[in-house]
From Swiss-Prot:
This is GPI-linked NAD(P)(+)--arginine ADP-ribosyltransferase 1. It comes from Homo sapiens (Human). Disulfide bonds join C53-C277, C174-C224. Belongs to the Arg-specific ADP-ribosyltransferase family. Residues 296-327 form a propeptide. InterPro entries: ADP-ribosyltransferase_ARG, ART. A lipid is attached at S295 (GPI-anchor amidated serine). Keywords: Disulfide bond, Glycoprotein, Glycosyltransferase, GPI-anchor, Lipoprotein, Membrane, NAD, NADP, Nucleotidyltransferase, Sarcoplasmic reticulum, Signal, Transferase. GO terms for cellular component: cell surface; plasma membrane; sarcoplasmic reticulum membrane; side of membrane. NAD(+) binds at Y121, R179, S233. It is an enzyme of class 2 (transferase). Residues 73-273 form the TR mART core domain. Its EC number is 2.4.2.31.
Length: 327
């Protein structure tokens, strides 16, 4: 086995051991879902990856954002709060750069509006709940997205931010994360079913942090498109990893005790989108053909090394089904 693969296996083992430690810390809770849904491919979710139209979307943001602020006061207030916080952090950057715990510098192409969007999403406000509820329905039709989805700017900026943060990560780029949900038990279609999480899904690198959000359903997830956003969150102690709505997963194990929580273990498969560049197509492609890059639309298989890591994780889950770190 090559040394990088061996080191990756070691890192996974260390991560699993850390998950078994019972360490607690204060955390601000954010309810993630408001209704019960089956865990499936979430076909009504709006899953645009903006392949081939990122520059055109960026150019359209000023007018689009102004219009959306007028339609949603919660969105406008959260964005204002996040903008203020981002400016404060930028002013403190010289001080942070001397600290051993300083955040990593943003990746190439990461702009201020990406940082503001992530801060707005993680703020202790109703925005993330309203936004994800809208994302889960905006893909029911192209017309519904164009005429009724009032978070086009936020969806684009979060999507592009995760793409940039993901491309800027050092290997390994996949992460073992945990996700706790309060007041809702998800029901997967069955073992080995292919599913998506339906919206922008918050998870944590720390098992204990995820528990604070609930245990009615508790996920163990291998994500390869989710990106750590600790340095762009109002609550860095959560060690949050944000997963985009177009990442696909395979259900490798699921259980539900009679009076206990549902436990679901997912491994990354790739990505799948029904939509691409819908806003730009509507605004600029009516008078003639558009040439957009659709390379990001389909499924992308995992590497052999990551498949081996996922197998190792599954074996640990099977060996310790009731371990406190794998709830």
């Amino acid at each position: 086995m090559q040394m990088p693969a061996m080191m990756s296996l070691l890192l996974v083992s260390v991560g699993l051991m850390e998950a078994l430690q019972a360490q607690s810390h204060p955390i601000t809770r954010r309810d993630l879902f408001s209704q019960e849904i089956q865990l499936d491919m979430a076909l009504a979710s709006f899953d645009d990856q903006y392949a081939g139209c990122a520059a055109a979307m960026t150019a359209a943001l000023p007018d689009l954002n102004h219009t959306e602020f007028q339609a949603n006061q919660v969105y406008a207030d959260s964005w204002t709060l996040a903008s203020s916080q981002w400016q404060e952090r930028q002013a403190r950057w010289p001080e942070w750069s001397l600290s051993p715990t300083r955040p990593s510098p943003p990746p190439l192409g990461f702009r201020d509006e990406h940082g503001v969007a992530l801060l707005a999403y993680t703020a202790n406000s109703p925005l993330h709940k309203e936004f994800n509820a809208a994302v889960r329905e905006a893909g029911r039709s192209r017309a519904h997205y164009l005429h009724h989805f009032s978070f086009k700017t936020l969806h684009f900026l979060l999507t592009e931010a995760l793409q940039l943060l993901g491309s800027g990560q050092r290997p390994p780029r996949c992460h073992q994360v945990f996700r706790g949900v309060h007041g809702l038990r998800f029901r997967p279609a069955g073992p080995r079913a292919t599913v998506r999480l339906g919206g922008f899904a918050s998870a944590s690198l720390k098992h204990v942090a995820a528990q604070q959000f609930g245990e009615d359903t508790f996920f163990g997830i291998w994500t390869c498109l989710g990106a750590p956003i600790k340095g762009y969150s109002f609550f860095p102690g959560e060690e949050e990893v944000l997963i985009p709505p177009f990442e696909t997963f395979q259900v490798i194990n699921a259980s539900r005790l009679a009076q206990g929580p549902a436990r679901i273990y997912l491994r990354a498969l790739g990505k799948h989108s029904t939509y691409n560049c819908e806003y730009i197509k509507d605004k600029k492609c009516k008078s003639g053909p558009c040439h957009l890059d659709n390379s990001a639309m389909g499924q992308s298989p995992l590497s052999a090394v990551w498949s081996l890591l996922l197998l190792l994780w599954f074996l640990v889950v099977r060996a310790f089904p009731d371990g406190p770190g794998l709830l």
